[in-house]
Amino acid sequence: MRKRKVRTVFFIFLLLFATGLVGCGQKNIHKRNLCHIVLEAGDGYRVTDPARTVESGSDVSFTVTLDDNWQLLGTDYHGETEITKESDEKTVKIVLHKVNYSESICIQAEKGKYEITYDANSGKNISGDSDRVSIYYLGTHQRINTSIGTDLFTRDGYTQLGWNTRADGTGQAVGLGSRIAWKKGLVLYAQWVPWTDEKDFVYKEVSGFAVITSYTGKEQQICVPSSLGGLPVRTIREQAFADTDCKTVILSPGIYEIEKWAFRNSRLEQLYLYDDLVKISDYAFQDCDMLRTLHINAIEDPAYSGNYFDTFQDKYDRLLSLKDKKKIVLFSGSSTRFGYDSEMIDQAFSDYEVVNMGVFAYSPALPQLELIRSCMKEGDILLDSPEFDAANRQFCYQKELDYATFAMMESNYDAFAGLDLREYTQTFTAFSAYQAARQDMERKNYDICASNYDEDGHEVEEPSYNEYGDYVVYRPNSTSEEPIYGLPVNYTVNAFPKETYIDSVNAEFQKFLNQGIKVYFTYSPRNKYALSEESTKEERIRLHEYFKSQLNVPVISELEDSLYTGIYLYGTDNHLSTEGAQIRTEKVIHDLKNQLKKEEGE
């Protein structure tokens, strides 16, 4: 029986009381070095043999059976906990590693509310039971992450390409692990693609793996098999698919590396891959000028769940849900996450919904803005406030993607498929960097939500993000006006060349304007003492006039209003305190109202 393994590590700083109380039980040091471990009873599950006695320093395992609709979230064990869920989604094996003393352990379980039924659709249930499997979800996100599929169903000679709301594939498609809006009675059907005939591949055996050296077929759609000649396919060598006249390539799970020039000068238009592919670079697709779409299916557990990168997809969920409604979208990097009280904007502009799409300034803004634009309509408002310390990214000049781009896509890879790869560079090199970055990270699950953690990754009792996407953990004012970092930023005309930054951001703004979307430029907050020596008052006046004359959208705010004493900043030189965010929001509301009133009078 195939199992999906989730390895989670729980670290708790223990306060040793005289009584020896730990967690839910009592710590006892036994002369015979024996430890008595008990899994406590609770709602939603049953434990087989809940009491065990083992030698100190050894592992102890338990089998837990979940009730219908329940999910096991973890335990309060202080050490490393290994949780293995069988494909029936009800039987769970818990292994507590290196127990050193006696204690009772609490299991954390919660009842799922949202049922999705998965249909094998000519595939086979891995558990050998029914061709349909129902899974219940907690609904921690506005949309629900689907099953990765490969842990539910299999089909000899086929690769699962995704899910669809109709068996014949004519309904709504969703990638494995990506998100879908839930509705009662939702059924998702596995979508299968047959492997391309083995005779079309030339390969050799290397260390027990198949290495593809050439493709001799002429199919418009190629599905590279998971195995050839009974050997798992691991690598696609240089030039293997060079000059191939095909439109679609599907890389099956298990393929580890795509070497440089593997698809050089092919007619490839769209590519499917799984997130267990580790080594790949843009050299593999050199001169593939027609490649525009990348579909990524999840097969690995997520690493960035609960991280601020993960907030992008939660914000994107809200944006999608408001696609047909009138809205104001706030954008830049983390200064926008920290810098607005969106409820105030909502109240001030009651005809509009509000979405805060700010996440991270040091990743290219261009792909983020393109995804945002796809969800906006005529009459909507984009309020952009680029961060000057990341100007090459924030002004859409940087076309190279990076690891953070994919970190923001991890919990919904389908969003990335909405981008046209021809508008960007270093796509696959960035994906490889993302894979390297998360290689040694603790793996989590999609039910973990960023709003359960603060900016530093600590659990919080109240949600850290509100419905709009603002970071709302209380941030007191500082006691010092001094900058946090020694990073003086240039607020000078020379720092924003027209042929690079201005022309690039204007080109992106024009795409919004062409759709009838109103775009306004305001300034991101900054500690006024964290500017370069060249950024004098006179130079800042010149810069403000420069933006007003060169940008193709209205500059609605005064630059000087964006410079704050350090008292109103928190932790960095551009993250506002709670009070600072309210002060800034009041100013922006005033500026936006004046601009809209001015336009009404024209």
How should each PLM-predicted stretch be described?
Residues 327-414:
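Membrane-embedded segments
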Residues 24-73, 77-194, 295-298:
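Secondary-structure capping and domain/repeat boundary segments
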Residues 298-326:
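N-terminal secretory targeting modules
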Residues 200-207, 217-234, 244-257, 266-279, ...:
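Structural signature of tandem-repeat unit edges
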Residues 399-515:
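Secreted/periplasmic serine-hydrolase-like ester/acetyl group-modifying domain
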Residues 534-602:
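C-terminal regions of proteins
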Residues 1-32:
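Gram-positive cell-envelope targeting signals
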